[in-house]
Amino acid sequence: MPRDIIILECTEAKAEGKPTSRYVTTRNKKSLRTPGRLEKIKYNPFLKRRTLHREMR
């Protein structure tokens, strides 16, 4: 199955006006489990805590 390369960007740092952290990952193109944007809790080194990262388009 083909996979897409996606970028996850921190949502909390953007709201606070600090540098955003970004992660690169892959996802299945035709996944029925995650039809919308992917969201994961990842570590943000600028905020020094785990934050919500959302898929960019």
UniProtKB/Swiss-Prot annotation:
Annotated keywords: Ribonucleoprotein, Ribosomal protein
GO CC terms: cytoplasm; ribonucleoprotein complex; ribosome
SUPFAM superfamilies: Zn-binding ribosomal proteins
Gene Ontology molecular function: structural constituent of ribosome
Superkingdom of this protein's organism: Bacteria
Name of one Pfam family that matches: Ribosomal_L33
GO terms classed as biological process: translation
InterPro entries: Ribosomal_bL33, Ribosomal_bL33_sf, Ribosomal_zn-bd
Cleaved signal peptide residues: none
Entry similarity comment: Belongs to the bacterial ribosomal protein bL33 family.
Name of the protein described by the UniProt record: Large ribosomal subunit protein bL33
Organism: Akkermansia muciniphila (strain ATCC BAA-835 / DSM 22959 / JCM 33894 / BCRC 81048 / CCUG 64013 / CIP 107961 / Muc)
